[in-house]
Swiss-Prot record:
DRBM domain: residues covered: 161-229
Lineage, top ranks: Bacteria, Bacillati, Actinomycetota, Actinomycetes, Mycobacteriales
E.C. number(s) listed in UniProt: 3.1.26.3
Family note: Belongs to the ribonuclease III family.
Protein known as: Ribonuclease 3
Gene assigned in the entry: rnc
Length: 230
């Protein structure tokens, strides 16, 4: 295990076997270029479920008076590609991207800082921690890594539904309905979407996500904050 991997495990606060950690950090692009090595996709699948359960349970207990719909929106503001990627960027001084095994093409195109890849990497690490240590330990890791998001999500207000809130704000100011211009990059199996909010003829916000919907929500959030502060 390298010193950089030791730093990553220190940031996570757990120990993992070298083989399991390697799988958790192996992106499919690296596997394709190196004879079909095991990738982190199965661990990502597992980690996604563990993360969703942990955040859902925590929100359920923290907010006993909130309706199911509000809890779902709170969870969506925490468990999404951008939030996961930001958590990944905060792991070690270099960020998670520096520890991932990426194919040369992906690495040369900036894959180490691509939100979708970082988000998948965080989930795969959580899956590995669950396999090695069980639910109690991975829950502790998740609550530490996502603690700030759990604390701030209820204070976002409009953030529970950025697109609707933006539309209400632009209508109140007589600016007309916001439009969303969406583009995508990357292969079909690993697309990243970019959305820009246009109101009138001016651009007000930009967002990136693993899906078109997520990119639009991020762009709406950015546009809302820009307008709200002007």
């Amino acid at each position: 295990m390298t010193d950089s991997h030791a730093a990553l495990l220190e940031a996570l606060g757990v120990a993992l076997p070298a083989e399991l950690l390697t799988i958790a950090l192996t992106h499919r692009s690296y596997s394709y270029e190196n004879g079909g090595l095991p990738t982190n996709e199965r661990l990502e699948f597992l980690g996604d479920a563990v993360l969703g359960l942990t955040i859902t349970e925590e929100l359920y207990h923290r907010h006993p008076d909130r309706a199911e719909g509000d809890l779902a929106k709170l969870r969506a503001s925490i468990v999404n590609t951008q939030a996961l990627a930001d958590v990944g960027r905060g792991l070690t001084d270099e960020g998670l991207g520096a520890h991932l095994f990426l194919g040369k093409g992906e690495e040369n195109s900036g894959g180490a800082d691509k939100s979708s890849i970082l988000a998948d990497g965080v989930e795969s690490l959580l899956g590995a921690i669950y396999l090695e240590h069980g639910l109690t330990v991975v829950r502790e890791v998740i609550l530490r890594l996502f603690g700030e998001l759990l604390d701030t999500a209820p204070t976002l207000g409009a953030g529970l539904d950025w697109k609707s809130s933006l539309q209400e704000l632009t209508a109140a100011r007589g600016l007309g309905a916001p439009a969303y211009v969406v583009t995508s990059t990357g292969p079909d199996h690993d697309k990243e979407f970019s959305a820009t909010v246009v109101i009138g003829e001016a651009e007000y916000g930009h967002g990136v996500g693993r899906t078109k919907k997520e990119a639009e929500l991020k762009a709406a959030a950015s546009a809302y904050k820009t307008l709200d502060e002007s």
